A protein has these predicted regions:
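P-loop NTP-binding core
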Residues: 113
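N-terminal secretory/targeting leader peptides
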Residues: 18-108, 116, 123-332
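Sec/Tat signal peptide C-region and signal peptidase I cleavage site
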Residues: 11-17
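Intrinsic disorder/low-complexity segments
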Residues: 9-10, 140
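Bacterial N-terminal signal peptides
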Residues: 2-9
Length: 332
């Protein structure tokens, strides 16, 4: 009888997966961009009552950081998570978020980048459906010696990527560009003396074994991420599935920011307890000196992209307003 009722559609049961989506990501599975991917998969499958099945591919097994965006456009993966910050100049609206403006947390920056993209609908993202946006936590300094002043950082070999390398150069350090995965060996061999990144990597990549000092309040930059879907795949989805995905877009940005901010706190607690890592903060007067050196980066962004027809002043004004608004809303 149950079989008859089910066949007649009179009893509700989880639907057979009718729609399969492939989701590519580039960092290793335990890292926060992949944790947010698994959370999104679980929620979409649950909220569509099993109608959608999402197959996830972490660790560059399907697409890597360099071909992620083009791979999604080409349909190699239905969905992909890319670090827009890794491609300077390709995503100029989002790039405003990566400037050195002292983001207090990943949550504040993640909700801000989502709102910014929603408002400006950047033409560089027109070929895809934007599923969500988020950032890593603010980048701070993990090092083999205490960094308490500009003098301490002068000529000091620190790994950074994208905008971070430019920031370190301006501050007088000796930036070394390399992927996060190469850092442990470079630290071990003394090729670099530290790393400038969000602090969850102290535990995730075990940098606390080498970097016994952290300067935790410089908040130099964030790395922005976009999760995008192949446009044809999106267009082919039924309306009820589209609604589930649309309803999760901002929610996922908030969830990811809060998850990784909490993860930073856990990682720092672990680093202090397990490896006796010493955490320092710069006094405001010293911090002001650092940011005074970095101000020209804002001017350069304004001029360079304004010359290309982007309303950069309005974009930066909005970024600062969003930062102020969400800093209050999501105060630590």
């Amino acid at each position: 009888m149950v079989a008859v009722l089910l066949g007649a559609g009179l009893l509700s049961s989880p639907a057979q997966a009718q729609i399969k989506l492939s989701y590519a990501n580039f960092p290793p599975a335990p890292t926060f961009p992949c944790v947010q991917m698994e959370r999104w998969k679980t929620e979409v499958e649950k909220r569509t009552n099993g109608k959608v099945k999402v197959d996830t591919y972490p660790g560059s097994t399907l697409l890597n950081p360099k071909n992620m965006f083009d791979g999604v456009i080409a349909g190699t993966a239905d969905i992909g998570c890319l670090a827009t910050s890794y491609q300077p100049g390709a995503f100029p609206v989002v790039e405003a978020i990566d400037l050195p403006i002292g983001w207090p947390s990943a949550t504040v920056a993640s909700v801000s980048v989502w709102d910014l993209v929603e408002k400006y609908k950047p033409k560089e993202l027109e070929k895809v459906k934007v599923i969500t946006m988020f950032t890593c936590p603010p980048a701070n300094i993990m090092s083999m010696k205490p960094i308490l002043s500009l003098g301490d950082i002068k000529g000091y070999e620190l790994r950074a990527s994208g905008t971070g390398a430019k920031i370190l150069e301006i501050l007088g350090a000796a930036p070394v560009a390399m992927p996060q995965s190469d850092v442990p060996e470079a630290l071990q061999k003394g090729v670099i003396k530290g790393n400038v990144s969000s602090l969850e990597v102290m535990k995730d990549f075990k940098y606390a074994e080498y970097c016994h000092y952290v300067t935790s309040n410089v908040n130099l930059f964030v790395v922005s991420f976009a999760v995008v879907m192949n446009q044809a795949k999106w267009n082919a989805l039924p309306d009820d599935v589209k609604k589930v995905i649309d309803d999760m877009r901002k929610e996922q940005a908030i969830w990811t920011g809060q998850y990784v901010d909490n993860h930073v706190n856990e990682a720092m607690k672990w680093s202090k307890e397990t490896h006796k890592v010493q955490v320092n903060t710069l006094p405001k007067a010293e911090l002001d000196k650092w940011y005074a050196l970095l101000n020209p980066m804002m001017d350069k962004y304004l001029k360079d992209y304004e010359a290309k027809g982007l309303p950069t002043k309005a974009i930066l004004d909005d970024v600062m307003k969003l930062k102020a608004k969400y800093s209050k809303e999501y105060a630590k």
